[in-house]
């Protein structure tokens, strides 16, 4: 009988384990909520749905303090710290009145429930669509409720001529249900690019598409699940999407330049027969392609910002999810009976480690933004500091949780402090760089020369590089030795090589490592449209070099001729000595000495006169 019963017992055990695992997964996704409609039972959320409360006193609760106490009463196993009205609405079925069990006809009600927040407050990650902007408003002196924060976000977007896409609370106050800031996403009411702007007739080639019909760039922006599983981590997904975006922009700009050069060639031919008409056509051509160029320029900037914002959102979402999981593990370890020191220490250090990763990512992103777009970096510097302060506050709250059990705190706190000491110097150096004020670059004067052919002037007019591009002094970048901890297997990506590579590509003056020069132009388009100017400058430099070389050679020849002529005219100096044949007789030597003294032999003189 024993062997026949054992398989059935194993099936029951495995089934119970499966049910327990399913309940654990569902509890991870479960978020406590309550909803109220006056004269109807209060509803609270459970993993299986919504459950009514027959207590009439809880039917019409409105004050945040009362709602917080109600949440703590309904969910005693959760650490409820605050309440927040949801930014979305939910439909609750079968919401009947008191003493009514079924009301199918009029039982569905759509309300905005209240979220019972568990653990430390964390602001939501907002999606930033294309051509939209993300901003925030924070006044620590004022604490507002949900509706007032909503009005603040709408007024801020309305002041920009935009509409509010979404918003979320930024920082909680001491009073439940009140917050001292709001973050929001504003979107334009109309399209960014005017419809009247003419674009090239033929569209640029389409990048290669994935198996589901989307290219890497589009799939990345849409968050396609199949695309997400194609790459190992977020860094690879971002680089693949960026590569496709840059390819698309290059092909689009190259096509525009080809069309423009073809139109310029037609104007040159027209100039031979009708110069006046050619001038008019050239002016019209310049204005038209100037609009196209600036439209493409703005579109490229918007696409790059959208890609970077999506990348930041993915990373922040990963970090927030990881924090939530580790926070729940820490809470479970603290509430365990009896609490285990090893689990508490492991959960606390893991959570602090993720928070420190969030810090390092924020530092790296801000430094990259400061190198590529100083103006945008200056605009978000205050928000970056607030984000870092929020991280520090959450870490302090986790450490305060340990104080609930002094014995456990005494055992695990030294190891946690030792672990946090690894990041102390890193945070200090990073904060020093973050608060560093960038000096204003000195602008150097730009000398321009008027070209004889108006087509080259039109090129500068279209691209806007004739007067807008102002070279600045290249200065060595003040690099500080910041030792960053190694990225372990839990890390989603190591962004530092990507940031360095992106900085080099984005800044046209980054030719050598350690130098920064800000140039006020769109590098990719401006480099392509200035090919004619580069060729003209190269030709002029070649002619000038040949002329200078010819003059130098001519001077060398003249000097050589003069020196040679002077040398041939130089007389031989004997200094009173005459070379005498060593084999001569003493008489011949005596005669030679007499001749050297001025004596002339009469016999020789006689014969010389006879020969003449």
UniProtKB/Swiss-Prot annotation:
PROSITE patterns: APP_CUBD, APP_E1, APP_E2, APP_INTRA. Expressed in the cervicothoracic ganglion (stellate ganglion) (at protein level). Residues 223-419 form the E2 domain. Residues 1-21 form the signal peptide. Residues 251-276, 437-490 are annotated as: Disordered. GO terms for molecular function: heparin binding; transition metal ion binding. It comes from the Eukaryota. Pfam families: APP_amyloid (PF10515), APP_Cu_bd (PF12924), APP_E2 (PF12925), APP_N (PF02177). Residues 130-189 are annotated as: CuBD subdomain. A motif (YENPXY motif) lies at residues 599-604. The chain crosses the membrane at residues 543-563. InterPro entries: Amyloid_Cu-bd_sf, Amyloid_glyco, Amyloid_glyco_Cu-bd, Amyloid_glyco_E2_domain, Amyloid_glyco_extra, Amyloid_glyco_heparin-bd, Amyloid_glyco_heparin-bd_sf, Amyloid_glyco_intracell_CS. Residues 28-189 form the E1 domain. Residues 28-122 are annotated as: GFLD subdomain. Gene3D superfamilies: Amyloid precursor protein, E2 domain, Amyloidogenic glycoprotein, copper-binding domain, Amyloidogenic glycoprotein, heparin-binding domain, Pleckstrin-homology domain (PH domain)/Phosphotyrosine-binding domain (PTB). Residues 564-612 are cytoplasmic. Disulfide bonds join 38-60, 71-116, 96-103, 132-187, 143-173, 157-186. SMART domains: A4_EXTRA (SM00006). Residues 598-612 are annotated as: Required for the interaction with kinesin heavy chain and for anterograde transport in axons. Keywords: Cell membrane, Cell projection, Disulfide bond, Glycoprotein, Membrane, Signal, Transmembrane, Transmembrane helix. GO terms for biological process: axonogenesis; central nervous system development. Acts as a kinesin I membrane receptor, thereby playing a role in axonal anterograde transport of cargo towards synapses in axons. Interacts (via cytoplasmic domain) with kinesin heavy chain. This is Amyloid-beta precursor-like protein. It comes from Doryteuthis pealeii (Longfin inshore squid).
């Amino acid at each position: 009988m024993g062997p026949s019963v054992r398989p059935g017992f194993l099936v029951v055990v495995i089934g119970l384990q499966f049910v327990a695992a399913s309940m654990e997964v569902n509890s991870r996704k479960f978020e406590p909520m309550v909803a109220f409609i006056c004269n109807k039972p209060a509803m609270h959320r459970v993993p299986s749905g919504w459950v009514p409360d027959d207590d009439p006193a809880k039917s019409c609760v409105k004050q945040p303090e009362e709602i917080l106490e109600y949440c703590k009463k309904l969910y005693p196993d959760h650490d409820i710290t605050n309440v927040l009205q949801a930014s979305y609405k939910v439909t609750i079925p079968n919401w009947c009145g008191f003493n009514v069990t079924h009301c199918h006809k009029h039982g569905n009600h759509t309300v905005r429930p209240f979220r019972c927040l568990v653990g430390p407050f964390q602001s939501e990650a907002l999606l930033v669509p294309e051509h939209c902007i993300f901003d925030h408003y924070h006044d620590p002196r004022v604490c507002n409720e949900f509706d007032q924060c909503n009005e603040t976000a709408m007024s801020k977007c309305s002041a920009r001529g935009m509409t509010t896409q979404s918003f979320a609370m930024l920082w909680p106050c001491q009073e439940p249900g009140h917050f001292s800031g709001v973050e929001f996403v504003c979107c334009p009411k109309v399209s960014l690019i005017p419809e009247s702007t003419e674009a090239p007739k033929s569209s640029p080639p389409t990048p290669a598409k994935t198996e589901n019909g989307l290219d890497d760039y589009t799939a990345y922006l849409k968050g396609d699940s199949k695309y997400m599983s194609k790459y190992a981590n977020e860094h690879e997904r971002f680089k693949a999407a960026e590569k496709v975006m840059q390819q698309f922009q290059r092909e689009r700009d190259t096509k525009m330049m080809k069309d423009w050069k073809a139109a310029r060639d037609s104007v040159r031919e027209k100039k031979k027969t009708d110069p006046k008409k050619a001038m008019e056509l050239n002016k019209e051509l310049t204005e038209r392609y100037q609009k196209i160029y600036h439209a493409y320029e703005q579109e490229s900037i918007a696409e790059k910002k959208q890609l970077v914002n999506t990348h930041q959102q993915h990373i922040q979402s990963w970090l927030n999810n990881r924090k939530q999981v580790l926070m729940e593990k820490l809470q479970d370890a603290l509430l365990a009976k009896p609490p285990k020191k090893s689990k508490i220490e492991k959960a606390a250090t893991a959570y602090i480690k993720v928070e420190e990763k969030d810090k390092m990512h924020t530092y790296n992103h801000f430094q990259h933004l400061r190198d590529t777009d100083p103006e945008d970096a200056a605009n978000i510097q205050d928000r970056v500091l607030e984000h870092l302060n929020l991280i520090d506050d959450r870490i302090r709250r986790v450490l305060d949780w340990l104080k609930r059990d002094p014995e456990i705190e005494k055992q695990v706190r030294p190891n946690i402090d030792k672990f946090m000491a690894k990041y102390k110097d890193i945070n200090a150096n990073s904060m020093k760089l973050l608060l560093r004020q960038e000096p204003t670059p000195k602008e150097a004067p730009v000398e321009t020369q008027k070209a004889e052919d108006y087509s080259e002037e039109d090129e500068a007019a279209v691209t806007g590089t004739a007067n807008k591009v102002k070279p600045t002094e290249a200065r060595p970048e003040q690099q500080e030795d910041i030792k960053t901890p190694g990225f372990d297997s839990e890390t989603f990506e190591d962004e530092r090589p990507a940031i360095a590579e992106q900085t080099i590509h984005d800044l046209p003056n980054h030719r050598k490592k350690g130098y920064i020069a800000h140039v006020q132009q769109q590098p990719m388009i401006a480099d392509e449209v200035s090919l004619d100017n580069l060729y003209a400058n190269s030709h002029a430099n070649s002619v000038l070099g040949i002329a200078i070389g010819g003059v130098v050679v001519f001077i060398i020849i003249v000097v050589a001729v003069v020196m040679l002529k002077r040398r041939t005219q130089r007389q031989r100096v004997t200094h009173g000595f005459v070379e005498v044949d060593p084999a001569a007789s003493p008489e011949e030597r005596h005669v030679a000495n007499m001749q050297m003294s001025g004596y002339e032999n009469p016999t020789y003189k006689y014969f010389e006169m006879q020969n003449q």
